[in-house]
Swiss-Prot record:
One of its GO terms (molecular function) is peptidase activity. It comes from the Bacteria. It comes from Aeromonas hydrophila subsp. hydrophila (strain ATCC 7966 / DSM 30187 / BCRC 13018 / CCUG 14551 / JCM 1027 / KCTC 2358 / NCIMB 9240 / NCTC 8049). This is ATP-dependent protease ATPase subunit HslU. A double ring-shaped homohexamer of HslV is capped on each side by a ring-shaped HslU homohexamer. The assembly of the HslU/HslV complex is dependent on binding of ATP. The keyword Thylakoid does not apply. Belongs to the ClpX chaperone family. HslU subfamily. Keywords: ATP-binding, Chaperone, Cytoplasm, Nucleotide-binding, Stress response. One of its GO terms (cellular component) is HslUV protease complex. It is found in: Cytoplasm. The keyword Ligase does not apply.
Length: 442
């Protein structure tokens, strides 16, 4: 798992997300506490439970983006799920236990990649030998049996050529593991686990089958390295490591949790609201979930929930669930200054993306400082007049601004366009002043 300090985590998040310092600090401390817990002795480690987080803030301010970036930094089993996908046990729809099953699958993939990377050197050696065997087959006697030949010098010459890439385009015939059977099983909602088990059964049927293929040396090397690395990894040990990683370092990001709040005016059973909250309680508190890889305890899995809470309030969550989300972080609405920074500061910002896209057509785009400021003001004004969708509004406004250039770019190779205040006003001014802003409403 990640050994980054909270300050380093916040610094990394700052490269992609503007503002929201409180939320960044909260997730950074939570992530670091995962590492701190693993340094304790076993008895104390068992007692230290994660402090789950509830992020509250309007749409488009960075809640989901924090989760996306955190997933890359965590280097631990991580899954992001929408709370609205689940229903109460006994009704049609996904059950909340599938969260832990999906998290375990993610851990298996993560651990397998890590283990295969460790075995890469040995796998490369084995793959190299198999390719040399295909390039320099042993002669056969009159009975069709292979005879060992002393071709060590020739083998060394070919090994040197292989490592230098001189044989990359040469075609050889190899026995490679057959691709797993692609079986798509349709099951009623809520029975995904049965579908997964049946798919695993069909895939195992053809697991040890070999197939002769003609393939170029470069492609053969990649395929053989993967095959040899997979052979060197112990599947049982891999499962144990993955389950341990889930239980100790697993992180679940539960988005749109405000959508499963029971609203006061509603009547009748809310199978996808309060029932889901009740089903989430044991997961968040700590229980044991049966997965196809083994039993998984959820006592030390970190849950980060988020929601806009525009209609519902955090207090509309059932009290037991509120108590299991002790750390509350409020994200603030974005201002014009924030929009201006979003357009220029993050890695691969919107302006950088459009410049790179147009450069493929030979068109140069230059954004002036006053042009970016006017664009930020335009997005903020539209948000104020209609529905406030936060930074997502920049995509809509930017696409409208660049519409003409994008359409004509292929005929205007070599030209330069300067996006300044006048250009923004000319393309967006009337629409911003007009009360009918349907073009901007997503």
């Amino acid at each position: 798992m990640s050994e980054m300090t909270p300050r380093e985590i916040v610094h990394e998040l700052d490269r992609h997300i503007i503002g929201q310092a409180d939320a960044k600090r909260a997730v950074a401390v939570a992530l670091r506490n995962r590492w701190r817990r693993m340094q304790l002795d076993e008895e104390m480690r068992h007692e230290v439970t994660p402090k789950n987080i509830l992020m509250i803030g309007p749409t488009g301010v960075g809640k989901t983006e924090i989760a996306r970036r955190l997933a890359k930094l965590a280097n631990a089993p991580f899954i992001k799920v929408e709370a609205t996908k689940f229903t109460e046990v006994g009704y049609v729809g996904k059950e909340v236990d599938s969260i832990i099953r999906d998290l375990t699958d993610a851990a298996i993939k993560l651990v397998r990649e890590t283990e295969m990377e460790k075995m890469k050197y040995r796998a490369e050696e084995a793959a190299e030998e198999r390719i040399l065997d295909a390039l320099l087959p042993n002669p056969r006697n009159s009975w069709g049996e292979e005879e060992k030949a002393d071709n060590s010098n020739t083998r060394q010459i070919f090994r040197k050529k292989l490592r230098e890439g001189q044989l990359d385009d040469k075609e050889i015939e190899l026995e490679l593991a057959a691709s797993p059977m692609g079986v798509e099983i349709m099951t009623p909602p809520g029975m995904e686990e049965m579908a997964n088990q049946l798919q695993g059964l069909f895939q195992n049927l053809g697991q040890n089958q070999k197939k002769k293929r003609k393939i170029k040396v470069k492609e053969a090397m990649k395929a053989l390295i993967e095959e040899e690395a997979a052979r060197l990894v112990n599947p049982e040990e891999l499962k144990q490591k993955a389950i341990a990683a889930v239980e100790n370092n697993g992180i679940v990001f539960l988005d749109e949790i405000d959508k499963i709040c029971k609203r006061g005016e509603s009547s009748g059973p809310d199978v996808s609201r309060e029932g889901v909250q009740r089903d989430l309680l044991p997961l968040v508190e700590g229980c044991t979930v049966n997965t196809k890889h083994g039993m998984v305890k959820t006592d030390h899995i970190l849950f980060v929930a988020s929601g806009a809470f525009q209609i519902a309030k955090p207090s509309d969550l059932i009290p037991e669930l509120q108590g299991r989300l002790p750390i509350r972080v409020e994200l603030t609405a974005l201002t014009t200054d924030d929009f201006e920074r979003i357009l220029t500061e993050p890695n691969a910002s919107l302006t950088d993306q459009y410049q790179a896209l147009m450069a493929t057509e030979g068109v140069k785009i230059e954004f002036t400082k006053d042009g970016i400021r006017r664009l930020a003001e335009a997005a903020w004004q539209v948000n104020e007049r209609t529905e406030n969708i936060g930074a997502r509004r920049l995509h809509t406004v930017m696409e409208r601004l660049m519409e003409d250039i994008s359409y004509d770019a292929s005929e205007k190779s070599g030209e330069t366009f300067v996006i300044d205040t006048d250009y923004v006003n000319a393309h967006l001014g009337k629409l911003i002043e007009d009360e009918d802003l349907s073009r901007f409403i997503l």
